[in-house]
Amino acid sequence: MQDQIILYNGPNSPFGRKTKVTALAQEVNIEEKIINVYEADFIDKHNPLRKIPTLVINQLSITDSDNICLYLDSISKNDTLFPKKNYWEIMNLTSIANGLMESVLERRMETIRSENEKSKSFINKQEIRIERTIKWIENSWNNYNNDYLTMDQIAIACALDYTIFRFNYRWKSENRKLNEWFEKFIKKNFMKTTKPYEK
């Protein structure tokens, strides 16, 4: 009997998208349920932090997008997204991409606060961090031309697309090598079918 795998996700979480892309790329069959974490108190029994994504397999709960991606990769019959020969480089770049997602998300949350509550200095700090991180990826990343798929590629693509979704397109003209790779990668079916949206 096949395990029932449920991914609790949101319509525009870059972390959730990363896990959905991983499932599609690794051909792991999952059921995705889009939820509003502010209302979904039922998920507390699976994840007391009430964060998405959260993966539930029968009675097992897996939280944190990296853990979920590792699990999905481990049960796939496809080649791993975490090859041993450059495992730590992949993990480091994935963490950098996660940090980029977090900065874009924190900037977004600050910009939608009321005018008397929002901090322009905090917003500016996040914008500087976003631009610095993308430039670092442009100059430091070595997996542009791999002929095989790895986790850092998925994470970086999701982070860059989320930057476009929540911030701006400016990085594209200022990081041409990265943008050239991104424009090709974003055309893959698992990216086209997981675009973030407002619900």
Question: Which sequence ranges carry the predicted segments?
Answer:
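GST-like fold's C-terminal all-alpha helical module
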Residues: A97-E183
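Generic structural signal for secondary-structure transition and capping sites
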Residues: K77, E102, N142, F190-M191
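Short polybasic/polar patches that bind polyanions
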Residues: L24, F165, K187
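Charged phosphate-binding loop/patch that engages nucleotide di/tri-phosphates or the phosphate backbone
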Residues: S173-E174, N179-K199
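GST-like domain detector, emphasizing the conserved glutathione-binding G-site
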Residues: M1-S121
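Conserved residues at the C-terminal ends of beta-strands
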Residues: N58, A157, Y197
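Non-transmembrane alpha-helical segments in soluble domains
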Residues: C69, D73, M91-T94, I134, ...
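Secondary-structure boundary motif
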Residues: K45, S74, N139-N146, K187
